Amino acid sequence: MTLGTEMSDNSLLSEDTDIDVVGDMGAKDGKYSDYHSDNDSDDNVARTPRGDPASPDLSSGSESNQRAEKSPKNALVKPPYSYIALITMSILQSPKKRLTLSEICEFISNRFPYYREKFPAWQNSIRHNLSLNDCFVKIPREPGNPGKGNYWTLDPESADMFDNGSFLRRRKRFKRQQSNEILRDPSSFMPAAFGYGPYGYNYGLQLHNYQQHPGATFSFQPSHCPLPPPASVFSSPTLSPFLGNELSRKSLYSQLSPTLPILHTLKPDAQSRPSFSIDNIIGGSGSTPSPTSPYTAQPGTHPPVIAMLSPSLAPMHNHLNLAHENLLPPGQNFSSKITNLNSCHF
């Protein structure tokens, strides 16, 4: 039978095929050489995985070369300090605790390579921080010290500006404190040599102290008018000689005050002045004006001085003359009426 022959052939094949149970075949072929038992300690040390070639790493070498080339550029890192801290460091390290702008920039450039490469791009920032912060005070250069630029120093009250002396942290913005007396009196900022007030020349001029008189009506005194020359005032030929001589020795304007009389009493010469007599006694006690009064001028004539000083006084002078003419007849005066009394003996 054909079936029997096939079965016989399969049996022959099965006898020739050997099954590896222990695993020696796998060890010989090399498929499971990586797997080993725990008891075989010698094989663990000696065996190495196959297919791992011991070739040098070329990629790691190229990366190390690139890092070496970039190392100088990475060293120029901006320092973690503000401009105020940099300026403070430069001033504190100086012997006199003051530096100019160029000296401050020189210190920063020598200390930090980053700013050395970036110079002078940051110089204006240093200048602005010096002028805008109250913790820095400008000191003018002495006349005998030649050079360019002013000195800069630290305000004594800004010593605790940084937290625990570390330049990395600043507590708060420093503001210069001013006393109340300085704020009340702005002129204290000005030197004593300048007498023009706190806002400079020709503004707020200091006036002289004025003492008010107790009898004055107003708190100010009116300015005196300039006096005209006597020759221009007394140029009229109708004025009597004694009147011109007397007025030329006196001031025409005393003070423009309503409490003073309009005109001073004129003094006649010694020749025309009567001696001690009844005329003086009656003239001082009576209601009629005395002969020495300015209103006893000749009727019909107007003194040019009164008309010149005030035109409003001329009608009043005419009224006084009319009243005087009504009392006495023309051509006579008061002294002629009492001439007979001088001969009487009492």
Curated annotation (Swiss-Prot):
<dbReference type="GO" id="GO:0006357">
    <property type="term" value="P:regulation of transcription by RNA polymerase II"/>
</dbReference>
<dbReference type="Pfam" id="PF00250">
    <property type="entry name" value="Forkhead"/>
</dbReference>
<protein>
    <recommendedName>
        <fullName>Forkhead box protein D2</fullName>
    </recommendedName>
</protein>
<dbReference type="GO" id="GO:0030154">
    <property type="term" value="P:cell differentiation"/>
</dbReference>
<feature type="compositionally biased region" description="Low complexity">
    <location>
        <begin position="287"/>
        <end position="296"/>
    </location>
</feature>
<dbReference type="GO" id="GO:0009653">
    <property type="term" value="P:anatomical structure morphogenesis"/>
</dbReference>
<dbReference type="GO" id="GO:0000978">
    <property type="term" value="F:RNA polymerase II cis-regulatory region sequence-specific DNA binding"/>
</dbReference>
<feature type="region of interest" description="Disordered">
    <location>
        <begin position="1"/>
        <end position="74"/>
    </location>
</feature>
<dbReference type="InterPro" id="IPR001766">
    <property type="entry name" value="Fork_head_dom"/>
</dbReference>
<feature type="DNA-binding region" description="Fork-head">
    <location>
        <begin position="78"/>
        <end position="172"/>
    </location>
</feature>
<keyword id="KW-0804">Transcription</keyword>
<dbReference type="GO" id="GO:0003700">
    <property type="term" value="F:DNA-binding transcription factor activity"/>
</dbReference>
<dbReference type="InterPro" id="IPR050211">
    <property type="entry name" value="FOX_domain-containing"/>
</dbReference>
<dbReference type="GO" id="GO:0000981">
    <property type="term" value="F:DNA-binding transcription factor activity, RNA polymerase II-specific"/>
</dbReference>
<dbReference type="GO" id="GO:0003677">
    <property type="term" value="F:DNA binding"/>
</dbReference>
<feature type="compositionally biased region" description="Basic and acidic residues">
    <location>
        <begin position="26"/>
        <end position="39"/>
    </location>
</feature>
<keyword id="KW-0805">Transcription regulation</keyword>
<dbReference type="InterPro" id="IPR036388">
    <property type="entry name" value="WH-like_DNA-bd_sf"/>
</dbReference>
<dbReference type="GO" id="GO:0005634">
    <property type="term" value="C:nucleus"/>
</dbReference>
<keyword id="KW-0238">DNA-binding</keyword>
<dbReference type="InterPro" id="IPR030456">
    <property type="entry name" value="TF_fork_head_CS_2"/>
</dbReference>
<comment type="function">
    <text>Probable transcription factor.</text>
</comment>
<feature type="region of interest" description="Disordered">
    <location>
        <begin position="274"/>
        <end position="304"/>
    </location>
</feature>
<dbReference type="InterPro" id="IPR036390">
    <property type="entry name" value="WH_DNA-bd_sf"/>
</dbReference>
<feature type="compositionally biased region" description="Polar residues">
    <location>
        <begin position="1"/>
        <end position="14"/>
    </location>
</feature>
<dbReference type="GO" id="GO:0006355">
    <property type="term" value="P:regulation of DNA-templated transcription"/>
</dbReference>
<keyword id="KW-0539">Nucleus</keyword>
